[in-house]
Amino acid sequence: MAKKEVKKIVLAYSGGLDTSIILKWLKNEYGCEVITFSADLGQGDELTPIRDKAFATGADKVYIDDLREEFVRDFVFPMFRANAIYEGHYLLGTSIARPLIAKRQMEIAKIEGADAVSHGATGKGNDQVRFELGYYHFNPAITVIAPWRDWKLNSRQALINYAKKNDIPIPVTKKRPWSSDRNLLHISFEGAILEDTWAEAPENMYVLTKSPEKAPNKPQYVEIEFRNGNAVAVDGEAMSPAQLLAHLNFIGGEHGIGRVDLLENRSVGMKSRGVYETPGGTILREAHMAVEQITMDREVMHLRDSLIPRYAEMVYNGYWFSPEREMLQTMIDESQKTVNGVARVKLYKGHCRTVGRKSETDSLFNLDFATFEKDQVYNQKDAEGFIKLNSLRLRIRSLMQAAKKK
């Protein structure tokens, strides 16, 4: 769609450097109505000045929607039922937020009769893919405006200069020059000193977690209850999904839990360094797997575990609304019907470790079967035939190799 044909744009607006300038740029370049949408996913004080800032920068209308409960209930929890983790370290805090933002942005576009949507993701990153796959899922004909792929402001310094020229306040200082993205699941950091892959992230970068060295010298034990694979209570106190994750963030943060420094493979093909704080999510995943250990059938667990990397890639690459992710989710949710119980974890100086698990209704652990002291329900001699059958292919292979050497 040509610029002159665009009548109304809904912009995913964070109030940060990129989207603040994009808002002004859209007004100047398209000369049409621009509506900003900001999702409250647990950013805290970051949202306080957004409404005034958006109007001051040229917004015609401003949406700020509290999506915290929906975020955790319908996006984070389903992902954690799958134990999803990308490349062994990343708990997908940014990745899982983008589908919800895209969903609500498209709902607003429909309500407002907008013919275009816009975002602040760069042309080198993952978020452009995540946003736009979501947009096209809800409206295949929507016009997407991605300024980073169109304008000539192709460096952070150029953006800062543009902002100064247009009197746009920006939250970037020499003391905190890196970019960040925060929600209830995590906070991520990129750029600046982190572009040197050998340099350690400075301690003043971290927001959610204490330094493990300065964390309490006494460990804290936390009990988390699960029903159908979802956390429902902490230390016996029932909480909503968003309340529960926020509570675990605070507890985990006090003990320095959930720091990750990762050089990850982006969906567009390049490598990128990110530093993440995911205190509550780290605790939640550890506890969830502990309850699974006592309630989930072995073959079901192994099959599900084999699919974790694929599921995580779908989330990371922006395919949350894809049929393949929905198919996997159905299978995973079926496996979670028996994941009912309580896990006890120990938090101490950056470490989260399971120290106990139990299930009153769905435990598959039977002491009579597992003990090494009794043979009432398990005849140890039966193991001989089991071993011989399972070793058959190995024995045949050895015999054939020996025959070749003769």
Swiss-Prot record:
GO terms for cellular component: cytoplasm. It comes from the Bacteria. It is found in: Cytoplasm. It catalyses: L-citrulline + L-aspartate + ATP = 2-(N(omega)-L-arginino)succinate + AMP + diphosphate + H(+). Gene3D superfamilies: Argininosuccinate synthetase, chain A, domain 2, HUPs, Single helix bin. The keyword Cell division does not apply. Its EC number is 6.3.4.5. It is an enzyme of class 6 (ligase). L-aspartate binds at T122, N126, D127. InterPro entries: Arginosuc_syn_C, Arginosuc_syn_N, Arginosuc_synth, Arginosuc_synth_CS, Arginosuc_synth_type_1_subfam, AS_cat/multimer_dom_body, Rossmann-like_a/b/a_fold. Its main location: cytoplasm. One of its GO terms (biological process) is urea cycle. One of its GO terms (molecular function) is ATP binding. The keyword Ligase applies. Keywords: Amino-acid biosynthesis, Arginine biosynthesis, ATP-binding, Cytoplasm, Ligase, Nucleotide-binding. Homotetramer. Belongs to the argininosuccinate synthase family. Type 1 subfamily. This is Argininosuccinate synthase. The gene is argG.
